[in-house]
Amino acid sequence: MIDIWQEIYSTIKRNKLRTFLTGFAVAWGIFMLIVLLGAGNGLIHAFEQSASERAMNSIKIFPGWTSKSYDGLKEGRRIRLDNKDFNTTNKDIPDHVIKGGASVYQGGVNLRFGPEYVNLNLSGVYPNHTEVEVVKLFKGRFINEIDIKERRKVIVLHKKTAEILFDKTHTDPIGQFVNAGNVVYQVVGLYNDKGDSGDSDAYLPFTTLQTIYNKGDKLNNLIMTTKNLETIESNEEFEAHYRKVIGANQRFDPTDHSAIWIWNRFTNYLQQQQGSAMLRIAIWVIGMCTL
């Protein structure tokens, strides 16, 4: 045993440069493997964290343009979702829809408090909006069902918006009244988002915004939380059925996927998991090849 170690030492001593370069190459390979694993796992965890902040069983529906003629109507027709679609979502698919919601927008509104103002977008939403989007309420409350029913003039502001409007006067925003185009709203809540990016939307009750800004029965998008849909196949079947239901309202071909766009977070998550598994394998293969 001692002879073996002496021979190894003698070989290393005779080939110092080769030994150094070999050791450096191995160390560099290990270092690169650690870096790749760290970066890859960090990316995967970031995706998982983002996904965990929203309800996995949530779906958003956006209107599009028809690409097929149907029922005497030509292709290229714009689909405009409305309250009938909202009611259909809530009432006609009870086996799979827990709760439906909707959003309607009004852009470029000046919101004022005293001499201070900020230009932003108003979003009319339902209470379940926070289940689908990352809205981190940290003071006060969000829109509730009574606000919707009574069309209350209440508003939820982003943290940055509140700072612009109220910080100079050291005023607590909750309970204060702000003016938006000669309409006065009471601030009932403050929220923050992960990006903390400037002046984000201010939230109103859906029915309030739809009424004040003369939107009629039109809306911008629908949301829903679902149940009893645990596989990609069952979700695809539900989406096909939902296109058929909304297609009956809006008179478009149920197989026309451009008429409405369905963003299903559950199926996206499953696809993301498959992508993450492939990424892990790729990182290990590349890392081992560097050794």
Task: Explain the meaning of each model-derived region.
Residues 41-121, 128-131, 211, 237, ...:
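Hydrophobic, regular-secondary-structure patches
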Residues 253-289:
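Peri-transmembrane interface segments
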Residues 21-32, 280-291:
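Alpha-helical transmembrane segments of integral membrane proteins
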Residues 15, 43, 61, 89, ...:
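Generic structural signal for small/hydrophobic residues in well-ordered secondary structure
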Residues 128-143, 153-253:
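Mid-to-C-terminal secondary-structure elements
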Residues 1-31:
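N-terminal Sec/SRP start-transfer signal
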Residues 69-79, 112-116, 190-195, 224-236, ...:
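Structural beta->alpha junctions
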